[in-house]
């Protein structure tokens, strides 16, 4: 298994999924995270988020770095849109608002936590139609298709791809939001 998919655990011997074929890895295996002892203790309240808690830090302004770009005041990166700069500024903050309940790793963005949780659950919703190998991320599937099967991306640069709705409880996938909503209702009813 590539190192990118390995996650450190406080468990003495983490579960080894290497012997499982991809067909079984795609099915839901949700470990009991309570056995890991929960996430590490929150940071003390004396540690403050410099981006929201202190008004004196509110004077961080983005310096234009060229026509139509906004520069980060803390590093040399530049962005075409304010929302992209705002998202980037979170990477400089020491506070991680989204904590993994299994290992305690923190993330700035809720989606990054959702993607990380797949390393614990084993859910691999992106399956190769040619060989059946499954992946946790769409970009990994696309790289596999290009390298192994020689299939170039079937979309143009910056073209929006079809969204895949993934149930993080059981691994169910659907490209239709109404089908996904019906499936989620089954989990709530149970």
Curated annotation (Swiss-Prot):
Keyword Zinc: yes
GO biological process: epidermal cell differentiation; regulation of transcription by RNA polymerase II
Keyword hit for Isomerase: no
Compositionally biased spans, kind Polar residues: 41-62
Record key words, sorted: Metal-binding, Nucleus, Repeat, Transcription, Transcription regulation, Zinc, Zinc-finger
Cross-referenced Pfam families: zf-C2H2, zf-H2C2_2
Molecular function as annotated in GO: DNA-binding transcription factor activity, RNA polymerase II-specific; RNA polymerase II cis-regulatory region sequence-specific DNA binding; zinc ion binding
GO CC list: chromatin; nucleus
Chief place where the protein resides: nucleus
UniProt cross-references to SUPFAM superfamilies, sorted A to Z: beta-beta-alpha zinc fingers (SSF57667)
Annotated spans, Disordered: 1-21, 35-65
InterPro entries given in the database record: Ovo-like, Znf_C2H2_sf, Znf_C2H2_type
Zinc finger (C2H2-type): 70-92, 98-120, 126-149, 165-187
Cell location: Nucleus
Matching PANTHER family: TRANSCRIPTION FACTOR OVO-LIKE PROTEIN 3-RELATED, ZINC FINGER PROTEIN WITH KRAB AND SCAN DOMAINS
Family: Belongs to the krueppel C2H2-type zinc-finger protein family.
Reported function: May act as a transcription regulator.
Name the UniProt record assigns to this protein: Putative transcription factor ovo-like protein 3
